[in-house]
Design a protein with these regions (language model features):
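Short linear regulatory motifs and low-complexity interaction segments
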Residues: 317-346
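Hydrophobic packing and interface segments
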Residues: 1-324
Length: 346
């Protein structure tokens, strides 16, 4: 039930988050068009310093707890660091929420720039190729998350095998007399972090290029929309589920009342919470935060190849509060360095 409850918490957490930044997008657009959306995205990014401070709090408290345990300090020291670590998990989830909201706003601003550069009127989902690419885009964050979590599993198993090898071959480790080979474990995690991200990176960069070249500008716009919507949902879900599982495990240090009975560390309920935390760590630390990068990078790659896909005989620039209303510009005088345009009546 711990796994089920954690999944439910993450899924429910998407509701309020999506409602809030959907309202932010809509109000910014109604007030100032896509310029307002761009300013909103800039304002969200202006909180970067605060986000970094919030995100740094959790790892500092977690490391303090690890140092306290390895130093065999008094139990109350570990209890205090666990409380701080629980707060750190919550603040980290808040910081990640800011990051994914800014990614969504940035993606919308980049989406508007993409439509302008390609010269298309909009994204018509009644077209079969556009709808197909919308579904493909929605699938990409799911596959990306799977690859990221699979990488964590592979690296973890390699680490476990290395630790077992050291226990077998280096005498006195368990008694505290032998010196473990720490560098080997660090080497395994570092190599896995670099090597296992090659495939997700290729998936992120190459897929929008292939969609654009083989299907065109409008289906690529549908693909971008699918990645953005699906990526935001998965990011919120995974960040909050992972944080809930981690905090559930830490709460057993002080004791948790379940069905009128106090459960402590080492109980069956605590073992279930440890299992949940094993699932939650790759959720909140690996695949969840990576959705932010996936969304932004997809939109940026699409924007880079937009001039190749677009038809620039007529350049359209959205100037009103409604995206459907565009003003056409035609070249009136052309020189080597300067283009002079005149407005054409609709």
């Amino acid at each position: 039930t711990n796994i089920i409850a954690g999944l439910a918490v993450g899924m429910k957490s998407t509701f309020l988050s999506v409602i809030l930044f959907s309202a932010a997008i809509f109000s910014a657009y109604e007030l100032a068009g896509f310029y307002g959306v761009a300013i909103s995205a800039s304002a969200m990014m202006a909180t970067t310093a605060m986000q970094l401070a919030i995100d740094a709090f959790g790892p500092i408290a977690d490391n303090a707890g690890g140092v306290a345990e390895m130093s065999e300090l008094e139990p109350e020291v570990r209890e205090r660091t666990d409380i701080l670590d629980s707060v750190g998990n919550t603040t980290a989830a808040v910081g990640k929420g800011f990051a994914i909201a800014s990614a969504a706003l940035t993606a919308l601003a980049l989406f508007a720039a993409y439509v302008t550069f390609t010269g298309i009127d909009g994204i018509n989902i009644f077209k079969a190729d556009v709808l197909a690419m919308l579904f493909v885009g929605g699938m990409i964050p799911v596959v990306f998350s799977a690859l990221a979590m699979q990488s964590v599993g592979k690296a973890a198993m390699e680490m476990v095998e290395e630790v077992r090898r050291q226990f077998r071959e280096i005498p006195g480790i368990l008694e505290g007399k032998g010196k473990p080979e720490y560098a080997k474990c660090v080497d395994i995690s570092t190599k896995a972090a670099l090597k296992e991200m090659v495939l997700p990176g290729i998936l992120t960069i190459v897929t929008p290029i292939l969609v654009g070249l083989f299907f065109g500008a409008e289906p690529l716009g549908g693909y971008m929309a699918g990645v953005c919507v699906s990526g935001v949902m998965w990011a919120i879900f995974q960040n909050n589920s992972g944080g809930a599982w981690d905090n559930a495990k830490k709460s057993f240090e002080a004791g948790v009342e379940i069905n009128g009975k106090m459960e402590f560390k080492g109980s069956e309920a605590h073992k279930a919470a440890v299992t949940g935390d094993t699932v939650g760590d790759p959720f909140k630390d690996t695949s969840g935060p990576s959705m932010n990068i996936l969304i932004k990078l997809t939109c940026l790659v699409a924007l880079v190849i937009a001039p190749i896909l677009g038809d620039h005989d007529d350049i359209k620039i959205s100037v009103s509060e409604k995206i459907e209303k565009n003003i056409k510009l035609k070249i009136e005088k052309e020189s080597d360095l300067v283009h002079i345009y005149r407005f054409e009546e609709q």
